[in-house]
UniProtKB/Swiss-Prot annotation:
InterPro entries xref list: Kinase-like_dom_sf, PDPK1, Prot_kinase_dom, Protein_kinase_ATP_BS, Ser/Thr_kinase_AS, Ser_Thr_kinase_AGC
Gene Ontology biological-process entries: cell integrity MAPK cascade; intracellular signal transduction
First-level EC class: transferase
Chain positions recorded as ATP binding sites: 16-24, 39
Residues the record marks as active site: 136
Gene encoding the protein: PKH3
Family membership noted in the UniProt record: Belongs to the protein kinase superfamily. Ser/Thr protein kinase family.
Stretches with biased composition (Basic and acidic residues): 663-673
MF (Gene Ontology): ATP binding; protein serine kinase activity; protein serine/threonine kinase activity
Lineage, broadest ranks: Eukaryota, Fungi, Dikarya, Ascomycota, Saccharomycotina
Identification of the protein by name: Serine/threonine-protein kinase PKH3
Region (Disordered): 629-679
Catalyzed reaction equations: L-seryl-[protein] + ATP = O-phospho-L-seryl-[protein] + ADP + H(+); L-threonyl-[protein] + ATP = O-phospho-L-threonyl-[protein] + ADP + H(+)
Length: 726
């Protein structure tokens, strides 16, 4: 008998992905040098998030299904635990997720779609023969081995027939809400029940997705998606083989008793050339049937550093929820059923399950639902069911709905080459007793190689400002602080990832930060906006765990974190974090503006007839003529005896826009004017101007100031790094 495994028996390589309650790594067993995938579940997380049930179900189901070594089931080799984590050692899937392959290909050729459907049908047939309903079939839960063969994974939502949630009453179907919105069966929505036929429904959705590139039912939010499902509201955007479309129409049927069974699917004309008894041919690798239209994708791992560190140092509790959290769909289904007034068996449908996984009592269609009796070649049109139309006028729209996938391609940079200077028109400056026209002002330009400073895939969640909220919440905020930000992210990281949207964050050469989602760019703010503050929060030990927080004063907070791109080349630049890029940009703009200010500064001589040239603020601001007597001279800073660093002189508020005419009313008496004109005012060397409302002026200690007068950069809240050591 082999000894019990432990984390120290494996070398941890790169991270492969995240689930709703786990993190997966590629590992190498030290003794055999065999590669596996290891799923690590934080005990604290699964207990705190009530995931113990899902972890237990997955382990028991994999042990049950692993008895026959079916090629379509991911195999569980070892399970063990330590004080902090649970560990599942499983088959490695070098080909990644089927969803990733589909996104790269956009659509599958008919040959590939048929081949994958054969393997799915054969695997689901085996799963059902073992008395198991998967209940969350989707391309994201289907993995590929190195030869391109499918392996169904993620059995955390599975239900074993004969084992109710209470451990008895084996003749009842599953009655808990699980699954993903776009693949949820209508009987789960309308009856609160899942059958074997519910998995068949998901297969129909997947076949449609193979040929069209997207699921058949996808609304602006989950509520709208549910309405499309119960109305069979889907269309074919791309021409498809009528036989394949006809098969989909036989599977996507509202009545589960009228829906095609797996046996009927196998006998359909679209599979006429398939020998279902020839398992070797069915389970050959998909790369062997690659055609010119669907080239073989590259399989392999990006080279990463070996993680040969103690397991306790691996940040497994950092969840980014690449897969949607099931509880999110659950709450949406509950809300949707409440809106329709559905609960229990309101539709009068018996819940008794027969041996074939279908209800014993035939399903009686509700008003507006008719069985689909069309032929094989017919395509199901969109139906209208007035019985369930309350949703049409009460669809709940969520501005934070998470998109199902990334845009098809990364937008190209807006322009290339070094941008030219921006020349501002001449402006008229009104001064007491005289009017002058200033010379054209050339705004400082940040020297960049391309128009795009940085762009990368991110997840983004926006929190609007509202005085009705106390502090900082996911729904709104009225105040912000380091502590509030740290508490929100550390305690609500999973909710943030569920509510977030996937897109591209882009910073152009003009300093505008934009969020690009589904081909549409939305400007967020200019980096040098005085009302913008920037924070950085690191939840784990990797730069991939960094959260970027952008706060627009009394407007919005944007919480941003990386979403790993499929190719590192899509990052601009590749190695810089967002915090590093923004900090570099602000510093460069500040240096340029300081140099420009020195060049444009005009000293006022004793000639009283001459007016000073106006001082210009940053590009994009209203330019104001400022009299020298209006410029306050800083008082000497008092040095702290303890720290040796001077206290801030003052806190700079947001700049106010003041017209030249209003400024002229502030003119002092003639005596003060003459006195002001008798000397040249130059800003002291130790004054630090800020572009953030949180930045403050600091001066050097008395000793340093006397010795060299060097400027000391102020302590800025614009970039704070909050590191949580777990």
């Amino acid at each position: 008998m082999s000894k019990r495994k432990s984390p120290h028996d494996f070398l941890f390589r790169e991270e492969l992905g995240h689930g709703s309650y786990s993190t997966v790594y590629r590992v190498v067993e030290r003794s055999s040098q065999h590669q596996y995938a290891i799923k690590i579940c934080s005990k604290r997380h699964i207990i705190g998030e009530n995931k113990v049930k899902y972890v237990t179900i997955e382990k028991n189901t994999l042990n049950l299904l692993g008895q026959a070594n079916h090629p379509g089931i991911i195999k569980l080799y070892y399970t063990f635990h330590d004080q902090e984590n649970l560990y599942f050692v499983m088959d490695l899937a070098p080909g990644g997720e089927l969803l990733q392959l589909l996104r790269r290909q956009r659509v599958f050729s008919e040959a590939w779609a048929r081949h994958y459907m054969c393997q799915l049908v054969d695997t689901v047939e085996y799963i059902h023969s073992m008395g198991v309903i998967h209940r969350d079939l989707k391309p994201e839960n289907v993995l590929l081995d190195k030869e391109g063969r499918l392996m169904i994974a993620d059995f955390g939502a599975a239900y074993t027939v004969g084992q109710s949630d209470a451990g008895s009453d084996g003749d009842k179907p599953a009655t808990s809400f699980v699954g993903t919105a776009e693949y949820v069966s209508p009987e789960l929505l309308l009856e609160n029940k899942s059958y074997y036929s519910s998995d068949v429904w998901a297969l129909g959705c997947m076949l449609y997705q193979f040929l069209q590139g997207t699921p058949p039912f996808r609304g602006q939010n989950e509520m709208e998606t549910f309405e499309q499902i119960v109305n069979l509201d889907y269309t074919w955007r791309i021409p498809a083989n009528p036989l394949a479309a006809g098969l989909v129409s036989k599977i996507l049927v509202l009545d589960p008793s009228q829906r095609y069974t797996l046996e009927q699917i196998k006998k359909h004309k679209w599979f006429s050339g398939v020998d279902w008894n020839n398992k070797e041919k069915i389970w050959r690798g998909s790369w062997t049937i690659a055609s010119e239209s669907t080239p073989r994708p590259r399989v392999g791992y990006k080279s990463r550093e070996l993680l040969d560190t103690p397991i306790k140092n691996i940040p497994v509790v950092t969840q980014r929820n690449k897969k949607p959290t099931k509880m999110n769909t659950t709450s949406s289904i509950v809300e949707w059923r409440k809106m329709l007034g559905l609960s229990g068996n309101d539709l009068g449908i018996k819940a008794t399950l027969g041996g074939n996984g279908l209800p014993i009592a035939p399903f009686t269609p509700t008003s507006g639902i008719t069985p689909d009796n069309r032929g094989d070649n017919a395509v199901a049109p969109a139906k209208t069911r007035d019985a369930f139309r309350p949703m049409s006028s009460r669809v709940i729209s969520s501005p934070h709905s998470k998109p199902s996938g990334r845009p098809a391609a990364l937008p190209l940079p807006l322009q290339t080459g070094t941008p030219s200077h921006n020349v501002v028109q001449q402006i008229v400056v009104n001064t007491p007793g005289r009017t002058e026209t200033s010379s054209p002002y050339v705004s400082p330009t940040v020297p960049v190689r391309n128009a795009i400073w940085k762009q990368d895939w991110v997840q983004l969640h926006e929190i609007p400002y509202s005085a009705k909220y106390s502090g900082l919440t996911l729904a709104g905020f009225s105040q912000v602080s380091d502590t509030l930000i740290a508490d929100l992210i550390s305690h609500h990281a999973n909710e943030l990832r569920t509510l977030s949207r996937t897109g591209i964050l882009s910073l152009d050469n003009t300093g505008y930060l934009s969020f690009i989602e589904q081909g549409r760019a939305r400007p967020l703010s200019r980096i040098i906006d005085p009302d913008l503050s920037i924070y950085e929060y690191q939840l784990g030990h990797s730069t991939e765990d960094d959260f970027l927080i952008l706060e627009k004063y009394k407007q919005s907070i944007w919480i941003v974190w990386p979403n790993k791109p499929t190719s590192a080349s899509r990052r601009i630049p590749i190695k810089e974090t967002w915090a590093q890029t923004l900090s570099k940009y602000k510093k460069q703009v500040s240096d340029e503006e300081e140099l420009s200010a020195k060049l444009n500064r005009t000293c006022v001589s004793s000639w009283g007839s001459r007016t000073p040239s106006p001082t210009y603020p940053a590009e994009g601001k209203t330019r104001v003529a400022v009299q020298p007597q209006d410029i306050p001279l800083p008082s000497p800073a008092k040095s702290s005896s303890n720290s040796g660093v001077s206290e801030p002189i003052s806190k700079i508020p947001p700049r106010q826009l003041v017209s030249a005419s209003e400024q002229s009313h502030k003119a002092k008496s003639e005596a003060h004017t003459k006195k002001a004109n008798s000397y040249s005012y130059i800003a002291p060397n130790d004054m630090v101007l800020s572009s953030s409302r949180y930045e403050v002026l600091r001066t050097a200690s008395n000793n340093d100031s006397k010795s060299n007068g060097a400027a000391v950069s102020g302590a800025s809240a614009a970039f704070r790094t909050l590191r949580v050591n777990k």
